[in-house]
Amino acid sequence: MLVSRRLTGARARAPLLASLLEAWCRQGRTTSSYSAFSEPSHVRALVYGNHGDPAKVIQLKNLELTAVEGSDVHVKMLAAPINPSDINMIQGNYGLLPKLPAVGGNEGVGQVIAVGSSVSGLKPGDWVIPANAGLGTWRTEAVFSEEALIGVPKDIPLQSAATLGVNPCTAYRMLVDFEQLQPGDSVIQNASNSGVGQAVIQIASALGLKTINVIRDRPDIKKLTDRLKDLGADYVLTEEELRMPETKNIFKDLPLPRLALNCVGGKSSTELLRHLAPGGTMVTYGGMAKQPVTASVSMLIFKDLKLRGFWLSQWKKNHSPDEFKELILILCNLIRQGQLTAPAWSGIPLQDYQQALEASMKPFVSLKQILTM
């Protein structure tokens, strides 16, 4: 099934010891200020003390909230998604690993409850998101340092704010940082139904770019295809269809893509390279297939293709906090204008985290699992 859509169409939019956690707090508070205690508390968090299967190592723990001082900010978490990077971090397969024990979650939105005397950029009532990965958002409350947070406007949907700081940021940076694309140019991507993939479709459309979106075949293929079209996808095809000779007919109506976005690797990434324009760039930001990216010598010599990688955490290290805040504001404007919506999602109460973890790790995941506090 090969589906096209014009840009002018409609857009819808096992146990942990308390002493371990106490030792964690004694090590110094780099991102948060929780310690464990034995009696029940209204402050709860999903904690892991070693790396492994999230379903086995994650536990719902009662934690103690420390006093707010100086540059501290007391935050009540509102919602936090479960992303692939969260799972990889818990498994120990990620480029950034917090000290153990740790609270899970890299992304989410919370509301400021109180601030310390030295806090100048935030006030009670403000919405905030993490400035960097590893903050530990799967909890009901926390005391963070002001520099660990970024304020976001409250006039955007809660689920959009909760999923703002990772996937849309990754999508935007990949679209604008590697090739100087102009309206009418095209982009090809795999894993198009992922959080990043859905953001790519919408942001590209807002920039006047056309998208060729590759997905794995599945039982509900038409439902998924229709949803991606509603987001603004120009073409949606399966991995198998991408290999068919008929695919070349797409390029009668649009130029060969100069940018490919790869989250899969293996044969899928090789197919993306095959359809790139000479001199084009493939950016790899994930490896779902757990297979290497392979490029033939002829692709590199005769087509002069470029292979790059992108990791948002590294981008943040290379850029100032103000530049990240500017990026967040750009994306918030797109949300306000109806040009960027949150991925299809399912809200799960924090205490039902096992259900959310299981759902997020199933094949052909169609709904983003968001923990609600």
UniProtKB/Swiss-Prot annotation:
Gene Ontology biological process terms, A to Z: ceramide biosynthetic process; fatty acid biosynthetic process; fatty acid metabolic process; intracellular iron ion homeostasis
Domain of life, per lineage: Eukaryota
Protein name: Enoyl-[acyl-carrier-protein] reductase, mitochondrial
Any one Gene Ontology molecular-function term assigned to this protein's record: enoyl-[acyl-carrier-protein] reductase (NADPH) activity
Function: Catalyzes the NADPH-dependent reduction of trans-2-enoyl thioesters in mitochondrial fatty acid synthesis (fatty acid synthesis type II). Fatty acid chain elongation in mitochondria uses acyl carrier protein (ACP) as an acyl group carrier, but the enzyme accepts both ACP and CoA thioesters as substrates in vitro. Displays a preference for medium-chain over short- and long-chain substrates. May provide the octanoyl chain used for lipoic acid biosynthesis, regulating protein lipoylation and mitochondrial respiratory activity particularly in Purkinje cells.
Transit peptide limits: 1-53
Subunit structure: Homodimer.
Catalysed reactions, semicolon-separated: a 2,3-saturated acyl-[ACP] + NADP(+) = a (2E)-enoyl-[ACP] + NADPH + H(+); (2E)-butenoyl-[ACP] + NADPH + H(+) = butanoyl-[ACP] + NADP(+); (2E)-hexenoyl-[ACP] + NADPH + H(+) = hexanoyl-[ACP] + NADP(+); (2E)-octenoyl-[ACP] + NADPH + H(+) = octanoyl-[ACP] + NADP(+)
InterPro entries according to UniProt: ADH-like_C, ADH-like_N, GroES-like_sf, Mito_Enoyl-ACP_Reductase, NAD(P)-bd_dom_sf, PKS_ER
CDD domains in the cross-refs: ETR
EC class: oxidoreductase
Record EC number: 1.3.1.104
GO cellular component annotations of the record: membrane; mitochondrion; nucleus
Positions of the catalytic residues: Y94 (proton donor)
Transmembrane segments: none
Annotated residues for binding of NADP(+): 167, 193-196, 216-218, 285-288, 310-312, 368
Modification N6-succinyllysine, positions: K61, K252, K267, K316
UniProt modified residues of type N6-acetyllysine: K61, K252, K267
Gene behind the chain: Mecr
UniProt keyword Nucleus present: yes
Family named by the database record: Belongs to the zinc-containing alcohol dehydrogenase family. Quinone oxidoreductase subfamily.
Assigned keywords, A-Z: Acetylation, Cytoplasm, Fatty acid biosynthesis, Fatty acid metabolism, Lipid biosynthesis, Lipid metabolism, Mitochondrion, NADP, Nucleus, Oxidoreductase, Transit peptide
